[in-house]
Design a protein with these regions (language model features):
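Non-transmembrane, interaction-prone segments in cytosolic or luminal domains
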Residues: 145, 153-161, 169, 194-199, ...
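Extracytoplasmic/periplasmic domains immediately adjacent to an N-terminal transmembrane anchor
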Residues: 2-211, 408-475
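Membrane-water interface of transmembrane alpha-helices
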Residues: 231-239
Length: 475
């Protein structure tokens, strides 16, 4: 009989192939499930969102009290449906002044508002009779800085549709009277007024027309998380190169890490606010808003640094990509669209820091409108304080694991003289541990890294990558 082929790593080649296929299959399945689950989650935020446009509330106040004001209601009855925002009529007694309507939209109670101007019908009648009256019958209010893409596609476009249908409703109600009384054939101005009877005035609380507006609540929310993860890998690699976890105690390491994280996120948030401002085009924002945006983003970035620090300390390396990707996806899913048009399940995202950051930024950019500070700041500071309370335990865990790695590496030294005389057998036994490891730069000279020390070192300093531009033998 033919002897079974032996693998250099020990065991038969058949057994090695079997284990390889099992390991590969597990990674294959787990990663497929990871991306399937995360992408299904974020796609779910947009599932049938247009069928929930009725969840957007728009205010209507009739200061006219005549045919023009009634034509707006007739138009809404034609448009009413799940795919159209709900038009909520309020009596003049609640909003006695048109400025009160704007204030209601600014406050965030409504996504938009339409009101019939005082005397709109009589002014239009004068325009039809003499050609000299005002045809500015309606005024509409909206906030272009509040989820700009949805404000443009769902609110602004719906208001434009309402105005167009209001014209048709006006013809239905009043065309016969106008044709009987107005001098349309003799007065071109009267004819023009009849052809375009309803005109509207726009009040956009904060015009946000720049192309980069689509990135504010999407890519810009996830990049800080990825940025902190990459810097954490660099910081861990530098800590490994300089043996910080064994040379300094947990308190000094924690203080050093806190100072470095504050400085890094301070500059990182400045850069993020900087590129938002650099590509603002004609967006009307000032230096005060820049500073407030910078400080808000700084808090958000530091929260994510602390979260990544905690995750990388306690989560096994093989599961860390699952945690980081999932954290990034659920955060961006909480800002990608308004909760009004997402399934109710997603409203748990109110508890996530990215959603609250975006609410703060909208208020800053809207000159104080859409005030959500009563909820946003407590949630963000709760995350920050909770992470500050947990991160010392993560630092202590890293230092203890690094010391254990050093002790494990010093164990086999006593057996060196005994094993040196065994020749080839020793070489074969050392083969599995002969691959390069950053442990060689962490443990003191004269100590040999072992499988256990390598494992512990990876737990203490992982994930990490070597310090760019610095040779390990120089440290």
């Amino acid at each position: 009989m033919t002897a079974a082929t032996t693998s250099p790593l020990g065991g038969s080649s058949k057994e090695v192939r079997k284990n390889f296929v099992i390991a590969l299959g597990m990674s294959f399945v787990l990663l497929q499930l990871l991306f399937l689950g995360n992408l299904s989650y974020i796609y779910g935020t947009q599932y049938k969102d247009s069928a929930r446009f009725h969840a957007f509330k728009m205010l209507y106040v009739d200061y006219d009290g005549d045919v023009v004001g009634q034509s707006v209601l007739d138009a809404y009855e034609i448009l009413r449906g799940n795919g159209y925002p709900s038009l909520i009529q309020s009596p003049v007694s609640v909003y006695p002044n048109p400025k009160d309507v704007k204030a209601a939209v600014c406050k965030g109670d409504y996504w938009g508002a339409v009101y019939a101007n005082p005397g709109a019908s009589s002014n239009l009648s004068a325009a039809l009779a003499t050609g000299s009256g005002s045809r500015k019958s309606l005024t509409y209010v909206w906030n272009g800085a509040r989820y700009p893409t949805f404000a443009q596609s769902a609110i602004y476009s719906s208001i434009m549709t309402l105005i167009q249908v209001t014209k048709s409703s006006y013809y239905t109600r009043n065309a016969s009277n106008v044709l009987a009384t107005a001098p349309l054939s003799k007065n071109p101005a009267s004819l023009q007024a009849f052809l375009d009877p309803i005109q509207a005035t726009e009040i956009n609380i904060k015009a946000t027309q720049q192309g980069t507006r689509v990135l504010y609540n999407t890519v810009s929310m996830v990049m800080p998380i990825i940025q902190q993860f990459f810097f954490m890998m660099a910081l861990n690699g530098i800590s490994a190169s300089f043996h910080l976890y064994t040379k300094l105690g947990p308190n000094k390491n924690g203080l050093l890490r806190l100072c470095v994280s504050l400085a890094y996120t301070f500059i990182g948030s400045l850069c993020m606010a900087g590129y938002i401002w650099a590509y603002r085009e004609s967006w009307d924002v000032n230096s005060n808003q820049f500073t407030l945006s910078w400080m808000s983003i700084w808090l958000y970035m530091h929260i994510n640094f602390l979260i990544v620090d905690i995750l990388t300390a306690f989560i096994p390396l093989q599961f860390l990509p699952f945690c980081i990707l999932t954290w990034a996806i659920i955060n961006v899913a909480s800002t990608i669209s308004p909760f009004e048009i997402s399934p109710g399940f997603y409203r748990w995202g109110y508890a996530l820091p990215s959603h609250e950051l975006y609410q703060v930024l909208v208020q800053i950019w809207s000159d104080g409108c859409e005030n959500q500070l009563h909820r946003a700041l407590p949630i963000m500071f709760s995350w920050w304080i909770a992470c500050l309370a947990i991160v010392p335990f993560a630092m202590r865990h890293r230092c203890q694991t690094a010391l254990a790695a050093e002790q494990a590496a010093s164990g086999p030294i006593a057996d060196d003289k005994t094993t040196a005389s065994q020749g080839g057998s020793t070489d074969r036994e050392a083969t599995p541990h002969s691959r390069a490891s950053s442990t060689r730069g962490i443990v003191p000279q004269g100590q040999r890294p072992t499988a256990e020390s390598i494992r512990l070192e990876n737990l203490a300093y992982g994930p990490s990558y070597p310090t760019p531009g610095v040779r390990q033998d120089e440290l």
